[in-house]
Amino acid sequence: MAGKISKEELEELREAFGKVDLNGNGFICDHELHDLFKEANLPLPGYKVREIIQKLMEEGDKNKDNMISFDEFVSIFQELKSGDIAKSFRKAINRKEGILAIGGTSELSSAGTQHSFSEEERFAFVNWINTALEHDPDCKHKLPMNPNTDALFKAVGDGIVLCKMINLSVPDTIDERTINKKKLTPFTIQENLNLALNSASAIGCHVVNIGALDLREGKPHLVLGLLWQIIKIGLFADIELSRNEALAALLRDGETLEDLMKLSPEELLLRWANFHLENAGWSKINNFSHDIKDSRAYFHLLNQIAPKGQKDGESRIDIDMSGFTEKDDLKRAECMLLQADKLGCRQFVTSTDVMSGNPKLNLAFVANLFNKYPALTKPENQDINWGLLEGETREERTFRNWMNSLGVNPHVNHLYGDLQDALVILQLYEKIKVPVDWNNKVNKPPYPKLGANMKKLENCNYAVELGKTKANFSLVGIGGQDLNDGNPTLTLALVWQLMRRYTLNVLENLGDGQKVNDDVIVSWVNKTLSQAGKSTKISNFKDKEISSSLAVLDLIDAIQPSSINYDLVKRGSLSDGDKLDNAKYAVSMARKIGARVYALPEDLVEVKPKMVMTVFACLMGRGMKRA
């Protein structure tokens, strides 16, 4: 499809696609198109905008999944090149607020393509990174960066800053011993970028359209897109009930803990802000864009959460509310940010970002406020079933991160709750090449108030039917009702088979369609180890010897000779700590040589057969690319 247009046009379209795809999941949906036209302030009547969006969705959404993929986006432009609709669409894209167009420097753009990115995001992310990594000796050669220049896009080029930011968002994701830090060469830089991208994927970032070369060249829209995902994961990490029980203070009358657990981090943040605004006697807000533009809600929020000096060792911080009555919106925003600075929270937004209602940066600003000063007390006297707050298991987190890394929409925050209408599962079927009849068999949101659950249940029934009839999964005793109920064991059984098939498909594509199963992988592993003169071998994915990670480390060294520093590898009689050290090194090294491993070090130490299988399968995929 893309072959009919020039490389330059294709690159330009990729930029445009990135501007419309607000949540960065690789697809455009109708509400993103609405937001685009709203932001662009084009002189078009409302009915005309609706007509254009309807036409774009009709023309572009070839597989009728209510989303436009990049390929579909390209075909729209080919089909609508000269029409009024295409012109309006292009105007909307080019007028999107806060977009800075720069002449590109890559080969694709040498003919004058414009790369576009948000200056506001660059400014915000640079300041956040400068603060976060200020005392890291490994980043001294890059920091502090000037937020008003392109320093950021150069700074990420060797992969070190990206690796460090990933570890700040999800500690211990990357074993520091595997980051190349000294005397960097093009090869060792490539390894760092592999490590960063594969680790970002493992924590749930959608990196399908980003390659190491894009980062080395510092392509602004791709760098900012990846950084936002990494930063957001870190900001949202504790906005979750099992990690922060005081959030139960946000329960409303008649609600259970389960109701609260279904909310996304964004929804919880909004509820948190409104909880404090209500206590201040101020009207509630419905978003972090339009409703905060006048800064008044922020003034009240800061005043509510500022430490009152009533706890041991707590210093009182007084918020000066005099700026609240300032007539000028911009000056009022600046007064408010001066107060946020007293709390050490002047991050992500400038006064202009507040006044313009930049949704992404205001969300980050509020998330940072929550993390520093939640000002919530865990309710003690209410009849709350705290037993529900177990938090997700490692396996559940791995599955969730795998789904999100593939760009499913909506983003999966809670594994069971977010799969109850099966839309994510149906998207995963498409990823494993099982066709989905989006037109005739799938109900899509918004669901009707009456009978909403029936519509979701129909989707779940269809998902199970596809698994049995088209994917040939083993789904004995699993029905649509189980997915709809969020039954953990049965939902996991289906999700595991989806992930397993996805992993095996990658291998079969590399091996010219030859069928792959566990025995084929074990055989390949042992043959590769033996040919490289290694003494380790595995009998199956339950083999207790795997707990030392020596077979994994040897296999990595067999695939990429001399990549493993054996001085760092513990041998002999190993304690659990030694095994974990080896496993951390093995998982990061696998990612560094180019294997997209989702499993965690603990999975190797405990020899979890499913996750162990994915590790060896991913390494086999990397080894087959070498052959």
Curated annotation (Swiss-Prot):
Q: Where does Ca(2+) 1 bind?
A: 21, 23, 25, 32
Q: Where is this region: Actin-binding 1?
A: 105-378
Q: Please provide, in alphabetical order, the Gene Ontology terms of the cellular component aspect for this entry.
A: actin filament; actin filament bundle; cytoplasm
Q: Which UniProt keywords apply?
A: Actin-binding, Calcium, Cytoplasm, Metal-binding, Phosphoprotein, Repeat
Q: Which GO terms describe its biological process?
A: actin filament bundle assembly; actin filament network formation; bone mineralization; embryonic cranial skeleton morphogenesis; motor neuron axon guidance; pronephric nephron development; pronephros morphogenesis
Domain (Calponin-homology (CH)) ranges: 119-235, 263-374, 393-503, 515-624
* Name of the protein: Plastin-3
Q: Which gene specifies this protein's sequence?
A: pls3
